[in-house]
From Swiss-Prot:
GO terms for cellular component: cytoplasm. It catalyses: pseudouridine(1915) in 23S rRNA + S-adenosyl-L-methionine = N(3)-methylpseudouridine(1915) in 23S rRNA + S-adenosyl-L-homocysteine + H(+). Specifically methylates the pseudouridine at position 1915 (m3Psi1915) in 23S rRNA. It comes from Prochlorococcus marinus (strain MIT 9215). This is Ribosomal RNA large subunit methyltransferase H. S-adenosyl-L-methionine binds at residues 86, 105-110. Its EC number is 2.1.1.177. CDD domains: RlmH-like. The gene is rlmH. Disulfide bonds: none annotated. PANTHER family: METHYLTRANSFERASE (PTHR33603), RIBOSOMAL RNA LARGE SUBUNIT METHYLTRANSFERASE H (PTHR33603:SF1). The keyword Transcription does not apply. InterPro entries: Alpha/beta_knot_MTases, RlmH-like, tRNA_m1G_MTases_N. The keyword Lipid biosynthesis does not apply.
Length: 138
């Protein structure tokens, strides 16, 4: 079963749109252990360890449906799963090359703030799927 304390989101910049912030806060109430850090730059040295997985969000990444994403996250066993979200300029190629996975949320393009909200919802959904919660309906 997935635990929300295994996840951290590192994102460049602050959320400016109040309705996105409100949505994120709703999921934070459901998963208070989820770590969300707003940064100016990424430092992979701080995140890289034997017990950390680094997943970069990028439009050219691999796409999964919700069940597949849950299964993937379960396969990481007891490792800490760190998601990196860039700003409007995306994430540099060297960070992508040093990540464990490049993930795309959709073939559609989203503003980076909205991508943050969608990712948090998908983490919540994966946690719910893994615990057989009625939140996800196939």
């Amino acid at each position: 079963m997935l635990q929300s304390n295994r996840f951290a989101i590192y994102a460049i910049g602050k959320i400016k749109k109040h309705w996105i912030r409100d949505g994120i806060n709703q999921y934070k109430k459901r998963m208070p252990e989820l770590i969300i850090n707003e940064l100016k730059t990424f430092n992979l040295n701080n995140l890289r360890s034997n017990n950390n997985i680094i997943i970069v969000l990028s439009e050219e990444g691999k796409q999964f449906n919700s069940i597949e994403l849950c299964s993937l996250l379960l396969n990481f066993k007891n490792k800490k799963i760190n998601f990196l979200i860039g700003d409007t300029d995306g994430i540099s190629s060297d960070i992508k090359e040093n990540s464990d996975l490049i993930l795309s949320l959709s073939p559609l393009t989203f503003p980076h703030e909205l991508a943050r909200l969608i990712l948090i919802e998908q983490i919540y959904r994966a946690v719910s799927i893994s615990s057989n919660s009625p939140y996800h309906r196939s």
